[in-house]
Design a protein with these regions (language model features):
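Single conserved hydrophobic/aromatic residue that forms the stacking wall/gate
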Residues: 1-5, 9-12
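Conserved acidic/glycine
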Residues: 6, 20, 31-34
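Active-site catalytic microenvironments for nucleophilic, acid-base chemistry
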Residues: 19-20, 95
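Active-site phosphate/oxyanion-binding loops
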Residues: 28-150, 154-159, 165-170
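Cysteine-centered nucleophilic/redox motifs
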Residues: 11-19
């Protein structure tokens, strides 16, 4: 079959960056993202296979990959069941022991209300993992509750940043 969707997108982004002189490398998610027989991410497998991929490209400045796509325990192409790309970012961050996991969205950080609906909301600058997961569980659309778990287990802070205002602190 041919290239589709996210695969075409990441290849295009990679070629663009390389044309701009950036040492970017494409890391296909299907090479390291896998779920177990219960359709849950397999963090041990992810860490091992991702490290192998990273070691193949020591001089890269930027790594480009897909979100949400993976292989299941039977080797078939599948999707993460919940949280999609944000969950992928958290799983990767935990696998590489990142100093911070960044989730880019259309809102600057977690707010006390949804600023897409309520006027004059205020950002909540610091939350514990449990508080962020609870807000997400009870409807904060900016973040899916599953995204917090890998970051929590690895004790890595998660920063929610705004694609419309990239200089905002998040």
């Amino acid at each position: 079959y041919g290239l589709v969707g996210s695969e075409m997108c990441i290849r295009d982004r990679n070629y663009y960056l390389q044309e701009c002189g950036v040492k970017s490398i494409l890391l296909p998610a299907l090479e390291y993202m896998r779920t177990d027989k219960n359709a849950e991410p397999d963090p041990v497998y992810i860490k091992e296979k991702l490290q192998m991929q990273l070691e193949l490209h020591p001089g890269a400045e930027i790594y480009i990959t897909q979100g949400y796509i993976c292989r299941n325990a039977y080797g078939e192409i599948d999707n993460l069941q919940r949280g999609g790309s944000d969950y992928t970012a958290s799983l990767i961050g935990a696998a590489i022991n990142a100093s911070e996991i960044q989730i880019w969205t259309d809102i600057d950080g977690m707010h006390n209300n949804d600023p897409r609906i309520v006027d004059k909301t205020a950002p909540v600058r610091h939350l514990h993992f449990e508080e962020a997961a609870e807000l997400a569980y009870f409807g904060a659309k900016i973040l899916h509750p599953t995204c917090i778990q890998p970051a929590k287990y690895a004790n890595i802070p998660v920063r929610l940043l705004n694609t419309m205002d990239p200089t905002a602190p998040g």
